[in-house]
Design a protein with these regions (language model features):
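Hydrophobic alpha-helical segments
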Residues: 1-192
């Protein structure tokens, strides 16, 4: 299994139409910071969930992306689910989003990082599969969940908009949140 701790350059928002990505933001695009500070330490249960992950992800245009395991912790403290996420931490990576992927394994995802909490809108432009789009605030608390279907046969997905407020946007395969009993108020736990 390929697990790397993320050393991310965090960049602010980019007001543009993005595929499976942000289209509007209140964040500033000028500042970048390098950090290795974790949002939270993994518990033994979370570490066990991460150790079981072995997806063939990321691949293709995402193969060079940094990755981080992301665990969702329920309000009761229990682990809801875990995936290995490719990290989209630059304007170009956030713009591309998952639109170049034909599929993604159930144990894979993408974590979009921003320097601060902001209002953002993600779209399904050029997506080949449906997503759950999860917004989380600065401490990883989930604020919004959207279950976004793939665009129709004659659609490009640009009109499928999913707004939310957060510092992190986490995308997983559609219905992953339902299958794992994830809800608003649960928390994303990862190292960044």
């Amino acid at each position: 299994m390929r697990r790397r701790h993320l050393i991310a350059l965090l960049a602010g928002g980019l007001p543009a139409a993005l595929a499976g990505c942000q289209t509007d933001s209140t964040a500033d695009d000028a500042a970048t910071n390098e950090t290795t500070v974790g949002i939270d330490a993994f518990t033994d249960e979370e570490r066990a969930a991460v150790d079981r992950l072995d997806p063939a992800w990321p691949t293709g245009p995402y193969a060079s992306y940094e990755t981080t395991p992301v665990v969702v912790r329920g309000a009761d403290g229990g682990v809801r689910g875990a995936v290995v996420a490719a990290v989209a931490d630059t304007p170009d990576k956030r713009r591309l989003g998952l639109s170049a992927a034909e599929s993604m394994p159930a144990a894979g995802g993408m974590l979009f990082t921003y320097e601060s909490v902001g209002d953002r809108t993600y779209v399904m432009r050029d997506m080949s599969f449906g997503l759950d789009i999860i917004y989380a605030d600065a401490d990883g608390t989930i604020t919004t969940i959207h279950n976004a279907p793939a665009p129709g046969p004659d659609e490009n997905g640009a009109s499928q908009t999913y707004p939310g407020r957060g510092q992190y946007v986490f995308e997983v395969t559609r219905n992953w949140t339902t299958d794992n009993n994830v809800s608003v108020g649960d928390r994303l736990v990862f190292t960044r």
